[in-house]
Every structure is written in C-alpha cells, then in structure tokens.
C-alpha cells in the first residue's frame, strides 16, 4: 500500500538564518570523565549502529538521565538554534524550555545545581534529567510532544522513554516519544553541525518515524558485564535506529513492540 506524502522520508531544515559560531564558542573536546560523557555527544552525526563509535557501546550499559556534514538521512529533522553562550552544560537544556516559562528555567538550574554539588551523578539521576521535563513544563509530556513535533489528526501520546540514540559521533541523550501514529526522538540539547552552505550551526536532533514505516523492533542484548542493551528500530525503506540506556529496558521494549504490532494489525484490518 502506498503511504501518504507526509509519511515519506524527508529532512526539514528551518528557514530562519542559522547563527554563526564565533571562534571562542567552538565546541570543546569531549571530556573523558564518565559522568560528563553521560550528557552524550555535542556534535551532530548520522544515525548508526553502535559499533560506529565506542561511546555508543558504553552508553548501552548506562541509564539515561564529526563536525563534518552528514549524509542525507530521512526521518531526521534539523532546526537550527542559537548556540550556547557559556560552558555551563545546562545552558542547552535551558534553551529548550526558555520560551515556555521563566519558572522552567529556575527549575532546570536548580536541577543542575543539585546534580553538580552531589557526591556523584548517579545513573538514576541521569534518567531523571529527561523525565524532569514533565515537572518543568506545565502541560506535561503531551504538551511537550505537541510543541516539538506537532500532531497529526487523532494522534495521542502513549509513552515516553529517556534514552540515547546511537550515531556516528557517539550517543545522543534525549527522549523517545511513542504515540499511536509515530515513534519520535528529540535530543536534550542542541548539537553542533555544519550546514550544507558550510555555515556552523546548532540544532536539536529530532527523528520522526511514522508507525506505518516501521518494519521491525528488535531487542538486542550483548552478554557482557555489564550487559549492553539496545532496541533496534528498522524501517520499510531500509533505515535503522539504535536506542540504548533506557531507565527500564524491558518496559520500553514491551511498549514499542506492542504499539507497532497493534498498529500493523489495525492497518491490516482496515486495508483488508
């Protein structure tokens, strides 16, 4: 069955003028600190299997909390935003929420202060960095989903999962949004990338896959110590996405498998 034009793979780049990066604001090299690595990469990369970057495999054992131009990637949406103006790792997170309320900014800063001054940034805390969005935004995840991705007719958000997306430049920290129509992902903070024009910009990393385009959802567990746990999502047109670092891997796997199966069953019933 031929999908609608909206279901077809595409990249969308905002038409607003990207902000130029000054020399003093160039991204600093990633720290070797395990805790700081859990913020994920700050550089945009193409979706890729975990073996594409060693940090991806490390992230598979965590719990979530190439400045070169990438190849054409369907399902990936680029939205240039103003680059961070300080070295505070929280600033990009604040930037995501500042248009919604001043209160959200205060909550976010307090969150970072508590993490930074604590004895350690525990794995549980890293998972809560994403999930705290529900407390920061008055409308909860449903409102957040609508603001980031818009919604289709009769679309409702079912579940959200803090996790990482595997890319060629390392794991991207963010949240998976599962609705009755789509699987979507948005990074916690903007990432650095080079636009086709050669201009350096920052963009939130967003992936949107209609459930009609999902071919399979594959749980993958590598028996190591600790075990590496992934969820591989493949599309009908040959693309795949690897997610890892879930707070509750079994729950995320169950809901993704069930949602895709239910959609395919309903779709088959309608078309039949």
Curated annotation (Swiss-Prot):
Annotated Basic and acidic residues bias: 16-27
Span list, region Disordered: 1-42
A single cellular component GO annotation: plastid
GO BP term (any one): seed germination
Domain of life of the native organism: Eukaryota
Pfam families assigned to the protein according to its UniProt record, in alphabetical order: GRAM
Gene3D superfamilies documented for this protein: Pleckstrin-homology domain (PH domain)/Phosphotyrosine-binding domain (PTB)
Cystines in this chain: none
The GRAM domain, residue ranges: 143-221
Family: Belongs to the GEM family.
Protein name: GEM-like protein 5
């Amino acid at each position: 069955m031929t999908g609608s034009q909206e279901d077809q793979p595409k990249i969308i780049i905002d038409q607003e003028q990207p902000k130029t990066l000054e020399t003093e604001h160039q991204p600093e090299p990633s720290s070797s600190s395990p805790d700081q690595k859990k913020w994920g990469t700050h550089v945009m990369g193409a979706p890729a299997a975990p073996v594409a970057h060693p940090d991806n495999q490390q992230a598979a054992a965590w719990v979530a909390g190439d400045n070169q131009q990438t190849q054409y990637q369907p399902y990936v949406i680029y939205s240039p935003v103003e680059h961070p103006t300080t070295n505070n790792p929280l600033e990009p997170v604040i930037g995501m929420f500042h248009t919604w309320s001043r209160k959200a900014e205060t909550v976010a800063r307090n969150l970072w202060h508590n993490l930074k001054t604590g004895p350690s940034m525990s794995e549980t805390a890293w998972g809560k960095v994403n999930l705290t969005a529900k407390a920061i935004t008055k409308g909860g995840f449903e409102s957040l989903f609508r603001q980031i991705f818009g919604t289709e007719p009769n679309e409702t958000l079912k579940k959200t999962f803090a996790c990482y997306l595997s890319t060629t430049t390392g794991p991207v920290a963010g949240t998976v949004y599962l609705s009755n129509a789509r699987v979507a992902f948005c990074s916690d903070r903007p990432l650095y990338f080079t636009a086709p024009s050669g201009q350096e910009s920052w963009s939130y990393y967003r992936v949107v896959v209609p459930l009609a385009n999902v071919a399979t959802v594959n749980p993958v567990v590598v028996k190591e110590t600790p075990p590496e746990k992934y969820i591989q999502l493949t599309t009908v047109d040959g693309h795949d996405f690897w997610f890892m670092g879930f707070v509750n891997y079994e729950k995320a796997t169950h809901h993704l498998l069930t949602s895709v199966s239910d959609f395919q069953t309903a779709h088959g019933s309608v078309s039949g």
